[in-house]
Regions:
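Alpha/beta-hydrolase active-site loop
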Residues: 140-162
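Alpha/beta-hydrolase fold nucleophile elbow
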Residues: 165-176
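Alpha/beta-hydrolase
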Residues: 185-354, 358
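Small-residue-rich helix-loop
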Residues: 337, 341-414
């Protein structure tokens, strides 16, 4: 372990393994990829504590009396007592259905600090739909990062009151990915209510053109040897050519013929193709793609051989219904205003299309391909800001009336980053923030939207470096997972002492 000042970047090195702290989204669980990596899939649902509900304002900021029932769970560690209560640990809600109370297993932070765990379901995800409406009008009015954070502060006040805890009782926010960014944002926005935060793989910087996601995937696939990246690039260029020559035939190879007849079907198809290659990298299992490329392709593949290989591999890894869910179907999301569970996909796209961006575009071919630092794209080349903005407008039935939709989203993203600071610890609310631990992993393509360095000891940035260290620790060995946990304990021990 080495500490590099002034960036306060702690780096630990390990070999790749499989100790994830993050589960695959539902649309990636239909094939061999999930079956062969069971630790990436949540365990079967077991009967557990029933959730509680609290009436929460639909709109925390613009008045009105409307409320909705927020679903939440609480659980206490074995050693917790009213005489000596440990801190509250709030597990920030993510962009999907909540599964139940936080874990208090031995070794967890809640267990270590004899704390209370609180979990909840994010508004407009799962079955938590305020006003029972996911229309564009409802989402525009009531789905935002700040409405979610206000829900949590409201809930925490209720829990403290119910447990007879003082208003200043310490609270730690925890999360990974979007919920990791939320853990940091809530500490910034409500420092008097949130004592400290632990944020894993947090895309804290909203961004319009997130081509860095593509560049990071290409870099990860080039290690330990460039052959995997080069073959993936060749596969994507073969797919570009095949789609241009015969879109219907190419879609049929992926069991996606139904998308051809829809207005956004090609964009949906391209995004699914891109995700199929990106997901093994993101979840710490890039060898699944690299080994298949090495084993299945001849020495000098033709365009048809690349395309046929990738179609067969995609359906094998993610199942024959990969393109038949809502996540890669803009028509499904467009019509999902009253249709659980498709509403969750619609809600996440609304976040992307209205406030956070994260539009995962293909890296344009540089004018000088040999230029240092440029990785060729491992996504279909037609995934551009323009095509993804058009998809946003279609899903949410937005008429631009001559207004530049790209500029509108860019302005919303700039406003968001101006408030919270993006990844710049000297800007916005970030400038006065403290007691936030940022944890990232070297192969995670979301890392470029996280905090790469800070100049304050109260905002430590930790990077786990290994060939295969993916999102939220997926692909990291038990030893590196243990080391990360130890650092978190050290940080919280120090920070909670000062409250």
């Amino acid at each position: 372990m080495s500490q590099r000042l002034p960036s306060l970047l702690l780096t630990f090195v390990c070999a790749a393994g499989a100790q994830p702290t993050f589960y695959l989204p539902e649309h990636l669980r239909g094939g061999e990829f999930a079956a062969q990596h069971p630790s990436l899939v949540p365990p079967p649902h077991l009967a557990g504590p029933k959730p509680s509900f609290i009436d929460v304002p639909v709109d925390h900021f613009n008045g009105g009396t409307a409320t909705w029932k927020l679903k939440y769970w609480t659980t206490t560690s074995a050693e917790w007592s009213a005489a000596k209560p440990g801190p509250i640990f709030i597990e920030m809600p993510g962009e999907g259905a909540a599964g139940g109370p936080p874990s208090v297993r031995k070794g967890s932070l809640i267990d270590h600090f004899n704390g209370v765990g609180v979990g909840l379901e994010h508004r407009f995800f799962g079955t938590s739909i305020p006003l029972n409406s996911s229309t564009t009008k409802a989402l525009d009015a009531y789905l935002s990062v700040q409405q979610n954070l206000a829900d949590i502060v409201f809930l925490l006040a209720h829990i403290k009151d119910a447990m007879k805890l003082p208003a200043n009782h310490p609270v730690v926010s925890l999360g990974g990915s979007y919920s990791g960014a939320s853990a940091a944002w809530i500490r910034m926005l409500y420092p008097s209510q949130i004592t400290a935060a632990i944020a894993l793989s947090p895309p804290i910087r909203a961004t319009l053109d997130f081509r860095a996601y593509d560049e990071s995937n290409a870099a990860a696939l080039a290690s330990p040897a460039p052959s995997c990246r080069d073959q993936t690039v060749a596969t994507m260029r073969a797919l570009d050519a095949a789609i241009a020559a015969d879109e219907i035939k190419t879609m049929a190879l992926f069991n996606a013929s139904h998308l051809h007849a829809t207005p956004m079907g090609l964009t949906d198809f391209l995004y699914g193709i891109a995700d199929a290659a990106a997901s093994p990298v993101q979840y710490g299992q890039k060898a699944v793609l690299c080994s298949a490329l090495a084993a299945a392709l001849p020495a000098h593949p033709t365009q048809d051989e690349y395309v046929e290989f990738y179609a067969n591999w995609t359906l094998k890894q993610y199942g024959g219904a990969y393109f038949h869910g809502c996540f890669y179907n803009s028509d499904c999301m467009r019509d999902a205003e009253h249709a659980y569970p498709a509403e969750s996909a619609r809600s996440w796209y609304h976040f992307k299309c209205s406030e956070l961006g994260y539009l995962q575009t293909a890296t344009p071919t540089p004018s000088s391909p040999e230029r240092d630092g440029v990785n060729p794209s491992v996504r279909p080349s037609s995934l551009t800001v323009a095509t993804l903005i058009a998809q946003c407008n279609y899903i949410f039935k937005r008429e631009t009336h001559g207004v530049n939709a790209t500029q509108l989203l860019g302005a919303a993203i700039d406003k968001f980053n101006h408030k919270f600071g993006g990844a710049d610890s000297s800007a916005g609310l970030f400038a006065t923030a403290s007691k936030i631990g940022f944890f990232d992993y070297s192969d995670d393509p979301w890392r470029t939207a996280s905090v790469l360095k800070t100049t304050r000891a109260s905002l430590p940035v930790h990077l786990a470096v290994c060939d295969g260290c993916g999102h939220c620790g997926s692909g990291a060995t038990p030893s590196i997972a243990k080391e990360v946990a130890q650092i978190q304990v050290q940080l919280l021990t120090a920070w909670l002492k000062t409250t």
